[in-house]
Amino acid sequence: MEKENVFQKLMGFLNKAGTAIMMNLLFLVSCLPIVTIGAAWSGLYGAVRYTIRGDSWFAGFKYGFKCHFFRNLIGWIFGALVGGYALSRVYIGVMNIMADPAIMSAGVVIPLVISGVFALAAMLVIAVMLPLGMYFPQLDVNTWLVTTWDIIFHAPLQCLVVVALMWFPLALLIFEGLLYVYTFGLVFLAVYFVLVTFIATILLKKSLLRILKLYPREEEE
């Protein structure tokens, strides 16, 4: 009897691990065109939601990707442009200061801080906006943006944790000395983003439930 229980638990674990890997592979493939990263995140959140409630994860991914493609496409591109430009300014500024500390002045530090604020804001918005678009497709654009910032202000620490986890692979690619990215990258990413999505769902659950009371979710097809 004990052996059967152990075997069942092992098979259950392997099944969940296999599902997580398949979800991640589909997510990574969907991200290849770059502009579809927003829709792919929405699809991954849909897959996680469907899995939690016992439905087909593929159906959830398809629903999230298809139904929120254009909205998350716009949100992702805008956030990526703002955040990417701001991060590049921060990177250039920090490199210049490290090369010559004597150049530090208000004219250098203030733009650096402003760029950092814009970069953080863009990363926060992307991290919260994409799951919000999946959970509440009926929100119009203005309400969507306002609600995104509402979540950020009501749960700042949770949102920062989600941002840190979401952008961690990018940091590894930039500072590849922290990990042999090219050797273990695919194995690392094979389960990473699903874990991030589960964690983000848990951390933002209270905020999402609070918003659900204000904007009841439409039935999914």
Which residue ranges define each predicted feature?
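Helix-coil boundary and N-terminal low-complexity module in membrane systems
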Residues: 1-112, 123-128, 132-221
